[in-house]
Design a protein with these regions (language model features):
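Active-site beta-loop-alpha junctions enriched in small/polar residues
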Residues: 71-73, 136-138, 177-181, 224-226, ...
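Feature activates predominantly on carbohydrate-active enzymes
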Residues: 58-247, 251, 255-257, 261-264
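Acidic (Asp/Glu)-rich catalytic clusters
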Residues: 124, 163-167, 210-214, 278-282, ...
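Substrate-binding cleft of secreted/luminal carbohydrate-active enzymes
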Residues: 323-384
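C-terminal segment of N-terminal export signals and the immediately downstream linker at the start
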Residues: 22-31, 52-62
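N-terminal export signals
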Residues: 36-56
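N-terminal secretory signal peptides
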Residues: 1-36
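Substrate-binding cleft/loops of secretory-pathway carbohydrate-active enzymes
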Residues: 265, 269-301, 332-343
């Protein structure tokens, strides 16, 4: 069969290998013999079967994203406060206690300015270049001041902090999570989901935030974990599904993109609705799959964990741009392991960079935990 194909290729000067057309330049008069030609084609055949991005030397792209997700607002979870943490002045003895205390809704800002300042400088020092800021109800929005909690930043304060970040070489990116599991920051509007009033509020906030950030490259919309299992501790639980979920997602995307900004979301909807995700998710939306375990060997993973890791491969297969997300939320190995795995399976042209998400409040009790996350990214940058 190989001889037959070679005879055919010698007639036209081309060779079909798999589904790729390999053009072979050769000079019949200069060929020493037929055997040399066969060797050349065989070598080319092997090379053509290797993904081009694996053959290319991985080099650090100066524009590659090395991001940290930091919370200005931490009102992203429960709408009720456990009895242990009813005291608003509770003295947290550890980062874990600070996280548990800040996790339920608080009508005031759970944020420490000195901790924030230290983290920004640490990020710049290790070579990170982006801060994704979970804004929530921590800003006194002009369009909806009723959302702001006590001590929320003024617009002037926010602009000042954005300027400080840019001066440090850190690109600020806004995040408003519109998933119903994480929208308690919307206050009363979190109980008006998918109504006309709700759409008006979301439209106003997206537009105002984009203006405050001077038309950022990206706008993170969240959209993760909108399932009943993630709302078991909520008093008021709501889950959109089917066309309503997609319709609302398209609404948010439309509001972002009409201002010339690119939408960015968490990708875990695909864990449970893989076929629908790849059928309906626009390629214009930047994707962040996340997995916080230590095992990345698909042959040794069982479902559903295997699907969490494999989604990196699937997003690449379908041609989506990605910013894979790791964390020190569960262990100290995940972030660097995420970088090692994803740079092997994602084409550099679609690997926009990486994000760490510590999932801890920006409070003094969690400073060391945040610094550990930054150090892990710093090591990954050096090895990339």
């Amino acid at each position: 069969l190989l001889t037959k194909r070679l005879n055919e290729s010698m007639k036209c000067g081309t060779k079909i290998i798999g589904q790729k057309k390999l053009i072979i330049n050769y000079n019949f008069n200069q060929m020493s013999n037929r055997r040399n030609f066969i060797k050349q084609v065989a070598a080319a055949s092997v090379a053509s079967s290797i993904p081009s991005f694996l053959m290319a030397q991985q080099q650090s792209n100066p524009d590659r994203i090395w991001a940290n997700l930091l919370h200005l607002s931490y009102n992203m979870w429960e709408d009720t406060v456990p009895l242990k943490y009813k005291d608003e002045n509770y003295n947290c003895a550890s980062c874990q206690e600070a996280r548990e205390w800040a996790h339920p809704y608080r009508p005031f800002l759970t944020f420490d300015d000195p901790t924030w300042d230290v983290l920004l400088k640490e990020m710049a020092a290790v070579g990170m270049n982006m801060v994704i800021i979970d804004l929530g109800d921590a800003v006194q929005y002009e369009s909806h001041p009723e959302i702001a909690v006590k001590n929320a930043w003024t617009k002037k304060k926010l602009r000042s902090e954005l300027a400080k970040m840019r001066k440090l070489g850190l690109e600020p990116i806004p995040k408003l999570n519109f998933a119903t599991t994480h929208d308690i920051w919307l206050g009363e509007y979190s109980r008006m989901v998918s109504t006309k009033k709700y759409y008006d509020v979301c439209r106003n906030l997206i537009s105002e935030v984009i203006d405050l950030f001077n038309s950022p490259r990206f706008f993170h919309l969240g959209m993760d974990e909108e399932t009943p299992s993630y709302q078991q501790r909520f008093d008021y639980a709501i889950v959109r599904q089917n066309d309503l979920w997609w319709g609302d997602l398209y609404f948010y995307i439309g509001e972002v993109e009409k201002k010339g900004v690119r939408s960015w979301i968490w990708s875990d909807y695909a864990w449970h609705h893989r076929e629908l995700f790849f059928k309906k998710m626009p390629k214009s939306v930047l994707q962040s799959n996340w997995y916080y375990g230590t095992n990345f060997d698909l042959k040794k993973l069982d479902e559903p964990t295997k699907s969490y890791v494999k989604l990196y491969n699937d997003l690449e297969e379908y041609g989506y741009d990605q910013v894979p997300t790791g964390s020190n939320h569960s262990n100290e190995q995940n972030m660097e392991a995420t970088v090692d795995y994803c740079k092997k399976v994602i084409d550099p042209s679609r690997l926009y960079g990486f994000m760490t998400a510590p999932w801890r409040p920006t409070m003094a009790e969690c400073l060391d935990r945040h610094k550990e996350a930054i150090a892990q990214v710093g090591r990954a940058i050096k090895k990339f």
